[in-house]
């Protein structure tokens, strides 16, 4: 049973970005996920299968072209966020594809453009835009296969290196968010997390999902592993088959998740709506239903198909009502 402590106070904020310190009594910050609906922000990628068919010279030229394009696209994404007053941006997990291949071609290209990457990171801080990441579904730290666990760690190492090259802090301010993975493997999950490299663990967060782990289970893992929990209200109602975002357990788990954040002002949550029905796991185009408790959320990633259009719509009917 989860114990809710509503008397919890915020920790000292001296080491936080100045903008984070100024959030008291502010409206929630709504975040853009990876790309824009109007195609202004679109990243390029390459599959492993196609890559392996290329010669070494072709691999290098192809990856260099993709990386430089995506670097410019990341710059454009920050510009878009600035122009649309968005202070939260989720970076694409495919920003620099295949940079962890054994031939080290992608890795070497990243080193070559490291100065430009650092400038992007500096720009995000100058614009007061928080950048976060959600690695793909292949990250399964709770797997009973040692090979899958090692592959998962390798993926996280790739993303952590990108964040380091961007100069982003090794803290949940620049979080890398994953799901629990294989069900009924909580102890394995805790064990693997405890042994992760510092540049991964210092940024790692866990999110409740709609299939394998209940919100309470992920909360308990986060407490034991001493990492923050990203609460997803839609996953909660899907997993528990609830009929309202304002079910008491939604607010209870929102507050429980807040307990896992050393700095509650950094707490980040997700929102999506069902496409065809309230409990539909597929994301809708817009957000037309919000948990009342989310008015107390500092940071909200908007997971809707129409991206910035959904954010503008949400601002018009929800934030304006605060």
UniProtKB/Swiss-Prot annotation:
Its EC number is 3.-.-.-. InterPro entries: UvdE, UvdE_bac, Xyl_isomerase-like_sf. GO terms for biological process: nucleotide-excision repair; pyrimidine dimer repair; response to UV. It is an enzyme of class 3 (hydrolase). It comes from the Bacteria. One of its GO terms (molecular function) is endonuclease activity. Keywords: DNA damage, DNA excision, DNA repair, Endonuclease, Hydrolase, Nuclease. Component in a DNA repair pathway. Removal of UV LIGHT damaged nucleotides. Recognizes pyrimidine dimers and cleave a phosphodiester bond immediately 5' to the lesion. Belongs to the uve1/UvsE family. This is UV DNA damage endonuclease. It comes from Nostoc sp. (strain PCC 7120 / SAG 25.82 / UTEX 2576).
